[in-house]
Amino acid sequence: YGYFVNAAAQVAMRDPQFIQKYQNVINEIIGDFATYEENNSNSRYPFLRYFSTYEGHSWASGHANFGDGNNQESSSEAINAWAGLILYGQATGNKELTSLGMYLYATEVSSVNCYWFDTDGDILDEQYTEGKGENAKYSQASMVWGGKYTYAAWWTDEPLQIQGINILPMTPASFYAAANKDF
């Protein structure tokens, strides 16, 4: 849904009449993944459906029907969604939505740098990063689960695609991916 919100924000910033025509639809899309009012009887959507305020990042499915719990592989898509909220909030003058987007973006980026990219070198264990075992010599986790991390994608074991799942789409909101020159 983040792709739709981001695109809608881009159009809305250039064509204010777009908002008048499509605001209700866009607000429904946002509500589905980013409802920020807890215990709101007027909302048909759960509070921050895919985002865990405890973990500080999104989960791909929002459920834990896997042996290792929830999972998230496309951290960059989540970040793109939060950037879309910021832009849409700006385009519509909705300060609450802008603030929510800023919180989610900053929190998700911090978690991605920690859990996926391990930029401080204190999350991924030596067996994973230093050549001991089947998951040896990986500089990052491509998929984070509730109970493990892996270097894989659902459809391939090709490294370029595995890397790509956590950097695409590349937008101005992707600056975090290049902020650490050593990584």
Q: Model-found features: residue ranges?
A:
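Well-ordered alpha-helical segments within folded domains of soluble proteins
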Residues: Y1-Q10, E73-L87, S139-Q140
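Substrate-binding cleft of carbohydrate-active enzyme catalytic domains
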Residues: V5-I29
